[in-house]
Curated annotation (Swiss-Prot):
A motif (HCCH motif) lies at residues 112-142. One of its GO terms (cellular component) is membrane. Belongs to the primate lentivirus group Vif protein family. The gene is vif. Its main location: host cell. It is a peripheral membrane protein. It comes from the Viruses. Keywords: Host cell membrane, Host cytoplasm, Host membrane, Host-virus interaction, Membrane, Phosphoprotein, Ubl conjugation, Ubl conjugation pathway, Virion. GO terms for biological process: viral life cycle. This is Virion infectivity factor. InterPro entries: Vif. It holds the Pfam family Vif. It comes from Simian immunodeficiency virus agm.vervet (isolate AGM155) (SIV-agm.ver).
Amino acid sequence: MSQEKHWVMRLTWKVQEEVITKWQGIVRYWMNKRNLKWEYKMHYQITWAWYTMSRYVIPLPGSGEIHVDIYWHLAPKQGWLSTYAVGIQYVSLVNDKYRTELDPNTADSMIHCHYFTCFTDRAIQQALRGNRFIFCQFPGGHKLTGQVPSLQYLALLAHQNGLRKRSQRGETRRTRNLGSQQGAVGRMAQRYGRRNQQRSQTAFWPRTPIPSMELLSGGRGETGKTHSGKGI
């Protein structure tokens, strides 16, 4: 007896094949560089999901997972044999019956909470010395808030939460309590801190792109194009 098909409505973003190929290359790069425990499944490993070309499972420790499903050959009766689409959903590990669709901005914000911190160790040192600028390695993760936090604030959080796991050098220790009586480092920080420096609410993209869901769905990224979400 053949199994009956069960159709499920999903929110998807229709994208070009080259966008998917580019995003997959970015994911492979970061998975190898940072040893990310993201899981990649081919279509033959997802036999129960029709039209699914591949799936990426992104763990969110303590809560659930983000499933990124890439579909192909959708709606053949409409002549869409060579079209591709992307679906993003959150799957709870606490309640296995709960799952919900995600838009790219929300997915990027959730990923940003667990991966790809805003700042680097070098940027923290520059902030402690008085340089003020707005920068983030993953600007797509701040779409919901509309503004990237200042690096001084992020550096303070990193210091308090113990994210800097290396020994403090002499110059770094002297910058904990900046003042005019602390030698060259203190005077330099005091001088730079008084300067009028440019501010911006627009974050710059890093040299190596982050695997953003917005980039995958055809939204604003290096290409600068926008595509509306469509249910297929």
